[in-house]
A protein has these predicted regions:
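A generic, well-ordered mixed alpha/beta core segment in the N-terminal half of proteins
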Residues: 105-122, 126-135
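Short coil/turn connectors at secondary-structure junctions
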Residues: 56-58, 89-90, 100, 125-130, ...
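Amphipathic, small/basic residue-rich leader segments at the start of a protein or domain
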Residues: 1-95, 115-116, 120-123
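A gly/ser-rich beta-alpha-beta helix-loop segment of oxidoreductase catalytic cores
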Residues: 129-164
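N-terminal glycine-rich flavin-associated loop
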Residues: 92-114, 141-144
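Long, well-ordered alpha-helical segments
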Residues: 18-28, 112-116, 171-174, 212-222
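A short core secondary-structure module
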Residues: 169-223
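Short acidic, glycine/serine/threonine-rich loops at helix termini
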Residues: 73, 106-109, 143-153, 183-187, ...
């Protein structure tokens, strides 16, 4: 019995659109960005193609339709990822990280959070909304490199701690993150929203006592660096 892997007409159409975008819009910019020694400037050069990808529904298409997303399937998403990766894997990562940052809200957020955060992501009139995923950390004390299975004296995996300021009714995050995705935003002042994995129970290690915090762009006391 054979399996037919031929894409149906609608996905073939999507593939052609994604391929045309990658070849005609993305590739010329990638050639210039690859020559830029400053990594942040090279990242900023991707903003133009990103805005076009947003208009095509590639940046937020995986989000639920009821909150303004495209509600596309995993196969649709991978078609777009494959075509953009063929030209520049880094750009495909920018798109996919939006999912890492926003899908936890779609899965676990309250109705209010979904409408607030996902609604903002899918209705940006400037077509440049960026979500960040902030997990890994530099090794050291505190720190953990996001290795949840490491056994040591300090809590393993995540060293950034979030403490509740009861007076203000908000959490204060302390620590450093390393290799976060999209988190600096287009201008190193922060993505529109970052999902930051933190430890809310410092006495517990491994996978226990962890929480995901939604952090707005450029919160007080937060410094982003491309180095």
């Amino acid at each position: 019995m054979s399996i037919d892997f031929t894409l149906p007409p609608d996905q073939q159409k999507l593939q052609k659109i994604a391929r045309a975008f990658s070849e005609d819009v993305l590739k010329p910019v990638v050639k210039e960005a690859d020559l830029e020694p400053d990594t942040q400037k090279a990242f900023q050069m991707m903003k133009g193609p990103y805005k076009e990808a947003y208009k095509l529904g590639f940046a937020m298409g995986f989000l639920p339709k009821e909150y303004g997303g495209g509600g596309i399937s995993n196969v649709d998403l991978q078609i777009v990822a494959e075509e953009t990766t063929a030209v520049d894997p880094g750009f495909a990562t920018i798109l996919l990280v939006n999912g890492l940052g926003l899908m936890p809200v779609a899965w676990y957020g309250s109705e209010e959070q979904k409408r607030k955060w996902i609604g903002a992501a899918t209705s940006d009139k400037n077509h440049e909304y960026l979500a960040g995923w902030t997990v890994s950390e530099p090794a050291g004390t505190p720190g953990g490199t996001a290795n949840f299975d490491h056994l040591g004296v300090r809590p393993a995996g995540i060293g950034v701690v979030a403490e509740l300021d009861k007076g203000k009714g908000e959490y204060v995050l302390n620590g450093r993150k390393y290799w976060p995705c999209n988190s600096g935003g287009w201008d190193l002042k922060g993505a529109d929203v970052n999902v930051v994995i933190v430890r809310t129970a410092p006495s517990e290690g491994g996978k226990q006592g962890l929480s995901g915090m939604l952090v707005r762009a450029a919160p007080a006391g937060c410094v982003s660096s491309s180095r």
